[in-house]
Amino acid sequence: MNPYSSKSTYIALVLAMLASVGPVVAAEDDLGLELDEAGKIKTGAVLQFDLARTYADKEHWSMARSRAELAAQGGGSGFKWKISGRADADAVFAIDSGFYPDAVRRDQQYQFDLRETYVDFSAGDMDIRLGRQHIVWGEMVGLFFADVVSARDLRTFYLPEFEQLRIPQWAARAEYYFGETHAEFVWIPSPSYDRIGKPGAEFYPLPRGANVRGEVKPDASLGNTNWGGRLSRLIGGWDVSGFYYRSLDVAQTFYAVGVNDFQPRHDRIAQIGGTVAKDFGEFVLKGEAVHTRGRRFLSEDPTAPNGLVRQDTIDYVIGVDVPAFNEGHVNLQYFARRAANHDPSIGSERTEGGASILLNTRVTQAWEAEALLVSMLNRTDFMFRPKVRWSAAKNLRVVFGVDVFGGKPTGLFGRYDDRDRVYTEARWSF
């Protein structure tokens, strides 16, 4: 039996079930750019510095990253464009030189990304967007479920805010409105995939000691494109949507290619799902469900091809957001994954559930406090994230926080029990 299979099996299962845990669902355009009446070019920028120190087990600096994001947009009647890019430089590899493997340093020390870069125009009654763009179908606080199109940068786990964690897709998107119904079709000729980093990184998803070969990404071809459609409508005060999406999975499937060797690859999957939301005045109710076919999971069965078995799954989540405290709110969510054709060899139960609670309050005009707890319910496995946010000026925000992980080494959060950290973030937008 593979000595890493039980750990990797459970990790891969829950990773695919529980997506990002962040404070809020961010707006699609973080820079807030708008065209003036004359259609002149507008520009914007964000400068950010993140500093983190891991204090559990081997104490070390785990982040000292400077980030700059620039954007411009313009256009005229019936035509608009946007271009944006982001550059990172992480000095932690100079501060704690030698702590991380060279492969991790090469992957994370310097980086430039083209962010949202697209053109918008109309063709009759249809609106079209071509280029690198965010396509966000999920609307839950703190979790990815129906947001199936987005790729994510997971090299710092699920800790960054969503607008920083999402990776735009190169896509063609067409939208059409008829009555109160909104139809959307997307085609992604060159998909982006989750970034999980290199073995030895702070939040690499497989246990330390696993031998991981280079990731295999599908070749660029018509057969390796992604596509899907979504319908949404307001019915009696309920915002309801349904979608179908066929894609090469943004998440990695770890193939067993040797006794202790794994290789991340991307399988073809199909997903059908929907979302629902309603504002009752005193609270907001939201829910999402996604049925996924074609995804495979690591198995303890020594006869399983490549150490994998196929499991069709249903992910669902229901949440309520209630205004409370001093200009704050409470968010409660229950989420679960159920295997439609459960195979016990994957090392999990047929239904794996969890819950989250988010408490937010304004302490003073400039200070805000927040705490997020996410826990699995089938076993001890949790993450706790208290923090305070200081609005130092109109365009300057500073955050101080702690990230605490707990549980068994096979758990989604427990495997990072020795990565507890304190951090600060300064963000200036202009």
Tell where the protein language model's regions lie, with residue ranges:
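Transmembrane beta-strand segments of Gram-negative outer membrane beta-barrel proteins
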Residues: 31-56, 79-87
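Residues that define the transmembrane beta-barrel architecture of outer-membrane proteins
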Residues: 39, 62-66, 110-115, 166-170, ...
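Residues on the lipid-exposed face of transmembrane beta-strands in outer-membrane beta-barrel proteins
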Residues: 45, 68-74, 116-121, 172-176, ...
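Transmembrane beta-strands of outer-membrane beta-barrel pores
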Residues: 49-55, 76-78, 87-91, 123-125, ...
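Repeated loop/turn-to-beta-strand initiation elements of outer-membrane beta-barrel proteins
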Residues: 78-81, 125-128, 180-183, 237-240, ...
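Outer membrane beta-barrel
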Residues: 79-205, 236, 407
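Detector for outer-membrane/organellar transmembrane beta-barrel domains
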Residues: 245, 277-374
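Outer-membrane beta-barrel "beta-signal"
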Residues: 395-397, 401-404, 416-430
